[in-house]
Amino acid sequence: MSNFTPAWFKKGFFNESLFCDDFLSTHQLLYSNGAFFTPDGRMVDPMPLRCEIFEMMREYVGANLAKKVTNVVDVLKLAAQVEDFPPVTDRIALANGTLYLDGTFQEGKPEIVRNRLPVKYDPKATQPTHWLRFLSDLLYPEDIPTVQEFIGYCLIPSNKGQRMMVIKGSGGEGKSQIGVVLSRLFGCNMKDGSIGKISENRFARADLEHTLLCVDDDMRMEALRQTNYVKSIVTAQGQMDLERKGKQSYQGWMYARLLAFSNGDLQALYDRSDGFYRRQLILTTKDKPLSRVDDPDIAEKMAAEVEGILLWAFEGLQRLVKNGFQFTESERAKCNRELVKRDNNNVFDFLESEGYIRLKADACTSSKELYEIYKMWCEENSLNAIKARGFSDALIANQRRYNLESTNNIANSSGRRVRGFVGIEALVQPDLTPNSWRV
């Protein structure tokens, strides 16, 4: 044992508080929202911290050393606690410094950050040819800027864009290779997850705290029973109520972006609101050529270009910021969203059908009569009818689009005043006999 005795160990007594003061005087460390943060970002694994504390203590503290290390870590949480540690959105912390949105770069790690990417900034990095060729083979040219902007969007802890992305294909195109490359770019700041789990498990959101990106590599095809958790993540622009199993809920920063690869659409079982679909950027892949021979090493080749991919994504981020966080969206992508929306809500097709109803400014029809006609249209077209309440809600939500007006002052066949819509005329009417119709 050396002759030097630290201030936190005097006369055989170990002072945990003084130890933490000594430790924090030589280490940049803070504790907030249930996690330690350093100049390297969030401390994902506390074991290196415990090991360093152990090495400092082992020469002076003998019995129950492991337990005392645990106690020190707990005291360190109190000593390093800060009231708030909000995300900073005008810069990207990288392995060799900080890249600001205006393009300036500062070397070194002078400050504690929430997230630091494991990639070096090299303004002279070569163009990522494998990556660009892969995207060119996978996606339509007009959709590549959207991917560029979305990946760039994920570099900063901000949800201002209020969009998630779904890349949809038939299978075998290689779209999931994007996730492998992003894992190299984001490191521990990205998580593999499940959109379905997020939608149905109230604890799943807390698992995405401090995370920049969540990738669902193979999104489930089942429609989501509830969408509020997913929508809240996509649009969060501040602290959110988070809950971990067996613990009291708390307010935490949420800025994780959602990216899903799928062979189908992201649908909702009950939510047919425009907001659910408006938050999705839906891209479709090209058909895989029958003659194409897949390169089994393509993911590794692209990952080796990660410094060039960073520059490419940063260019997309700068364009997105310049456009006020409005994503570049091709007509194909817009059409994809409209098709998904219509597929989940056949009320649109009913309103645009012929022979059942007619849009007419001076006409009016009761909600009940419209729903009965809608059910007949569904039956004759082998479609599933939504419930009456959902049907009325869909009409109300889109009444401006079809020049309708919701009212509770329509006279039915019995002369009673009921709910209905002005601007639509029934061309068929239900008879009193069930399942019987007359024109």
Predicted feature descriptions by range:
Residues 1-32, 58-439:
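Feature primarily recognizes SF3-like P-loop helicase cores of small DNA viruses
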Residues 1-2, 35-64:
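Short, small/acidic-rich helices and loops at N termini and domain boundaries
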